[in-house]
């Protein structure tokens, strides 16, 4: 098995990812006021060659002290987006990456 920190690069923080986490906490930060889900979901940036079972094993080993169990892993490959640099004079692209939305079992949380 690879080093878990080579598989999981970092926590992915966006407004949508925070809304998913808020739904699992039941604090009403979702689309519907007071809505929540039983299974907590967290989003991570992962290695491009990481598979779903490898991501699940890496997260369970990183958070072994909290004894979390992964229920499911959904992966999304984000394509490079066009970008302009140096006040619009130079065209380029942002780097593409792979993100994983991980669902834990009820009662298990990393937060």
Curated annotation (Swiss-Prot):
InterPro entries xrefs: Nucleotide-bd_a/b_plait_sf, Ribosomal_uL23-like, Ribosomal_uL23/eL15/eS24_sf
What GO annotations for molecular function exist for this entry?
rRNA binding; structural constituent of ribosome
UniProt-listed Pfam families: Ribosomal_L23
On whether Ribonucleoprotein is a keyword of this UniProt record, the answer is yes
Q: Which GO terms describe its cellular component?
A: ribonucleoprotein complex; ribosome
Q: Which UniProt keywords apply?
A: Ribonucleoprotein, Ribosomal protein, RNA-binding, rRNA-binding
Question: Mind listing the GO biological process terms from this record?
Answer: translation
- Cited HAMAP family: Ribosomal_uL23_B
Q: How does it assemble?
A: Part of the 50S ribosomal subunit. Contacts protein L29, and trigger factor when it is bound to the ribosome.
Q: What does this protein do?
A: One of the early assembly proteins it binds 23S rRNA. One of the proteins that surrounds the polypeptide exit tunnel on the outside of the ribosome. Forms the main docking site for trigger factor binding to the ribosome.
The UniProt family comment states:
Belongs to the universal ribosomal protein uL23 family.
Q: What is this protein called?
A: Large ribosomal subunit protein uL23
Instruction: Give the species this sequence originates from.
Output: Chlamydia caviae (strain ATCC VR-813 / DSM 19441 / 03DC25 / GPIC)
